[in-house]
């Protein structure tokens, strides 16, 4: 699996979490098995990102709220909330270049957005 494919799986799991209160650790294991994520570095990336976003969720949401102009966080759609949390996590916590984080978010949005 490529990093982009793993990011998509992270996005889908976080999207699911926004809609359904479920056992996230159980779902992480299921997704790893279902998606055949085999390589240890891929599994580590997948788990680290999901757990990191969840652990830092309050910080990420506050940073998003501080950035929004003319909008409230509550008005954002589920897709937008997940992609923003994901992107903010990559930029702020993981120190991924903003160009990469934004490009990855755009590519996921193109694939999963209805517009």
Where are these regions (language model features)?
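N-terminal interaction/assembly modules
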Residues: 1-115
């Amino acid at each position: 699996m490529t990093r982009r494919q793993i990011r998509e799986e992270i996005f889908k799991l976080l999207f699911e979490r926004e809609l359904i209160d479920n056992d996230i650790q159980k779902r992480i294991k299921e997704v790893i098995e279902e998606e055949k994520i085999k390589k240890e570095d891929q599994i580590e990336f997948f788990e680290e990102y999901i757990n990191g976003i969840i652990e830092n969720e309050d910080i990420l949401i506050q940073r998003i709220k501080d950035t929004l102009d003319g909008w409230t966080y509550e008005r954002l759609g589920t897709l937008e909330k997940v992609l923003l949390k994901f992107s903010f996590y990559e930029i702020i916590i993981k120190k991924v270049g903003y160009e990469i984080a934004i490009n990855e978010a755009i590519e996921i949005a193109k694939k999963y957005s209805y517009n």
